[in-house]
C-alpha cells in the first residue's frame, strides 16, 4: 500500500528558484507547499539583492544623467538625493514585486507556509512557526531553494553600526562621505558605482589582480578605466589583516601594511548557502565549506528524492538561471527526467554604471582554444540614438568565426547593455546555419536605435576579412 504524504512536494524558499519549482509543479498537478522563512515571498532576490540594488542603481544613474545634461542643469542647480530618499524608491519596487509574486501563488492554489524548516527524516519536516508553534509536514519529494546570504568572517564585527554587508547596507540611515568596499566582485563593483554616483568617495579593495576576471579583458579594462576616471580608488591584490570599528567610522589594516579609514565599510566578499539550519544530516546530506549542495544535471542531490536549485548549488548564482533550474527540477521531479536544460551560454548582466553584459566566449578563451576568430566593434558615440540621449560611453563587440561567420561571443559595455545583449543572444541560439554575423548586415533595424550597434559592429568585423 503506497505511503500517504501531506504533499507531493515541499519547496523550501520562495526566491526565483523556489518560485520556478513551485509553479512548474502545480502546473503539472502536484500538491505543493512552499515554506518561506520571512513574512513576504520573493527571497533574497526581491528583498536584499537584485531588485533593490537595481532600483538604487536606476535612481542614481538618472541623477547622474540629469546633472550631466547641459539642457537641464547648470552649476548652480545640481540635483541631489539622500541615500534614504533613493531607498524609498527601492521599497516601492520591492512592494510591487512582492504583491505580484504573492498573486502567482494564490492564483495557482499553491500553499505558502511561514517558518523555519528542518528535516527530521527523509520524508518529514518540522516547521518552527513565527507564533512559537511547531508543525510537522510530510512530502514524497523536496526542493531546497533556500538561497544564500553574505559571508561573514568571524573576525569582522557586523553588529557595529558602521560595518555593513550587502543585505544590511539597504538599511543605512546616515549619509557617508567616504565608503570602503571590501571585495571587488559583481556586488562590490555595483555598489562602488552607486556610491560614486552619489558623490561619495569610494575605496574598492580587490583581493585579485583585476576586476571581474571572468569577463572579456577589454570589458574588465573598460570598467577599471571608468572607475578611475570617475574617482574610485581601486586597490588590487590586497587582503585585510584587521578591521576596527570606531565611533566615527571604520579603520581597515591591510596585510600589505596600508591603513585605510572611511565613514563605513561594505563587506562584499563571498556568499554562503542558507543550509545550516535545515538539519541536513538527518537525511544524509552534506554541504561543502560554503554551505552549498552538489547536484546532478536534473538538480538531484545525493538523496534522489531531494532536489536543490538556485544560489544553494553555487554557479551561476543568477536569479534568471535559478528560475529555469526550478522549472527543470519540477519537470524531473514529476516525470523522472527533464527534457529541458539550462542553455549553454547564459548571459551575464552586471549593473554597474554603465552596465556590462556578455554572452558566449571571451577573446582570451577563443585564443586559448586556437579558434580563428575576428572582431567587430561599434562605439556608442557613433550611433545617432546614443548622441540624442547623451549615452556616448560604451561599445559593442562581436566575436565571430572568420571562416563560418558563426557568432562566438558578444560583449557590451554601456547604458542598456543588459537589454542590448539579448538581440545577439537570439541569433547565437539559432540552429541550422542561422547563427551568422551576416544576419545583422542583411536585416533592417529601426533608426535611430541602440540595436543598430549590431549592424555597425557586423560591418566593422566583416571588413576585416580578406
From Swiss-Prot:
GO CC term (a single one): cytosol
Residues reported in the UniProt entry to bind FAD: 36-45
GO terms (BP aspect): 2-oxoglutarate metabolic process; NADP metabolic process
Enzyme Commission no: 1.6.1.1
GO molecular function: dihydrolipoyl dehydrogenase (NADH) activity; flavin adenine dinucleotide binding; NAD(P)+ transhydrogenase (Si-specific) activity
Matching InterPro entries: Class-I_Pyr_Nuc-Dis_Oxidored, FAD/NAD-bd_sf, FAD/NAD-binding_dom, FAD/NAD-linked_Rdtase_dimer_sf, Pyr_nuc-diS_OxRdtase, Pyr_nucl-diS_OxRdtase_dimer, STH_gammaproteobact
Pfam families: Pyr_redox_2 (PF07992), Pyr_redox_dim (PF02852)
Primary location: cytoplasm
Record key words, sorted: Cytoplasm, FAD, Flavoprotein, NAD, NADP, Oxidoreductase
Biological function: Conversion of NADPH, generated by peripheral catabolic pathways, to NADH, which can enter the respiratory chain for energy generation.
Family matches, as HAMAP family: SthA
Entry similarity comment: Belongs to the class-I pyridine nucleotide-disulfide oxidoreductase family.
PANTHER family per UniProt: DISULFIDE OXIDOREDUCTASE, SOLUBLE PYRIDINE NUCLEOTIDE TRANSHYDROGENASE
Official protein name in the record: Soluble pyridine nucleotide transhydrogenase
Amino acid at each position: 500500500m503506497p505511503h500517504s504524504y501531506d504533499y507531493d512536494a515541499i519547496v523550501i524558499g520562495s526566491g526565483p528558484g523556489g518560485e520556478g519549482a513551485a509553479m512548474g509543479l502545480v502546473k503539472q498537478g502536484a500538491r505543493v507547499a512552499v515554506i518561506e522563512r520571512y513574512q513576504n515571498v520573493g527571497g533574497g532576490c526581491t528583498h536584499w539583492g537584485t531588485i533593490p540594488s537595481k532600483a538604487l542603481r536606476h535612481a542614481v544613474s538618472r541623477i547622474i544623467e540629469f546633472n550631466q545634461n547641459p539642457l537641464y542643469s547648470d552649476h548652480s542647480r545640481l540635483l541631489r538625493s539622500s541615500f534614504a530618499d533613493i531607498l524609498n524608491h527601492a521599497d516601492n519596487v520591492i512592494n510591487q514585486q512582492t504583491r505580484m509574486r504573492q498573486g502567482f501563488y494564490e492564483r495557482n492554489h499553491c500553499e505558502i507556509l511561514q517558518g523555519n524548516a528542518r528535516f527530521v527524516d527523509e520524508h518529514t519536516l518540522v516547521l518552527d512557526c513565527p507564533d512559537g508553534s511547531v508543525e510537522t509536514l510530510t512530502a514524497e519529494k523536496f526542493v531546497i531553494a533556500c538561497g544564500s546570504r553574505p559571508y561573514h568572517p568571524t573576525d569582522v564585527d557586523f553588529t557595529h553600526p558602521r560595518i555593513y554587508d550587502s543585505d544590511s547596507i539597504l538599511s543605512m540611515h546616515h549619509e557617508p562621505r567616504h565608503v570602503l568596499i571590501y571585495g571587488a566582485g559583481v556586488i562590490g563593483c555595483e555598489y562602488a558605482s552607486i556610491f560614486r554616483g552619489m558623490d561619495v568617495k569610494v575605496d574598492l579593495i580587490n583581493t585579485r589582480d583585476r576586476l571581474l576576471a571572468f569577463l572579456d579583458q577589454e570589458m574588465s579594462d573598460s570598467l577599471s578605466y571608468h572607475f578611475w576616471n570617475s574617482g574610485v580608488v581601486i586597490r588590487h591584490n590586497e587582503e585585510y589583516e584587521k578591521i576596527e570599528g570606531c565611533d566615527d567610522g571604520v579603520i581597515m589594516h591591510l596585510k600589505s601594511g596600508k591603513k585605510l579609514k572611511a565613514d563605513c565599510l561594505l563587506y562584499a566578499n563571498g556568499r554562503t548557502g542558507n543550509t545550516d539550519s535545515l538539519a541536513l544530516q538527518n537525511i544524509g546530506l552534506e554541504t561543502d565549506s560554503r554551505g552549498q549542495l552538489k547536484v546532478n544535471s536534473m538538480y538531484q542531490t545525493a538523496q534522489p528524492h531531494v532536489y536543490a536549485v538556485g544560489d544553494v548549488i553555487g554557479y551561476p548564482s543568477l536569479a534568471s538561471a535559478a528560475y529555469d533550474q526550478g522549472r527543470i527540477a519540477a519537470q524531473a521531479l514529476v516525470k523522472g527526467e527533464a527534457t529541458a536544460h539550462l542553455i549553454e551560454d547564459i548571459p551575464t548582466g552586471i549593473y554597474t554604471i554603465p552596465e556590462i553584459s556578455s554572452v558566449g566566449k571571451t577573446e582570451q578563451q577563443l585564443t586559448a582554444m586556437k579558434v580563428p576568430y575576428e572582431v567587430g566593434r561599434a562605439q556608442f558615440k557613433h550611433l545617432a540614438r546614443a548622441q540624442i540621449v547623451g549615452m556616448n560611453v560604451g561599445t559593442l563587440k562581436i566575436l565571430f568565426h572568420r571562416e563560418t561567420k558563426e557568432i562566438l561571443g558578444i560583449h557590451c559595455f554601456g547604458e542598456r547593455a543588459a537589454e542590448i545583449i539579448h538581440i545577439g543572444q537570439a541569433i547565437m541560439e539559432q540552429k541550422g546555419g542561422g547563427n551568422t554575423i551576416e544576419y545583422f548586415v542583411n536585416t533592417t533595424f529601426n533608426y535611430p536605435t541602440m540595436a543598430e550597434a549590431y549592424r555597425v559592429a557586423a560591418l566593422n568585423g566583416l571588413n576585416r576579412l580578406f
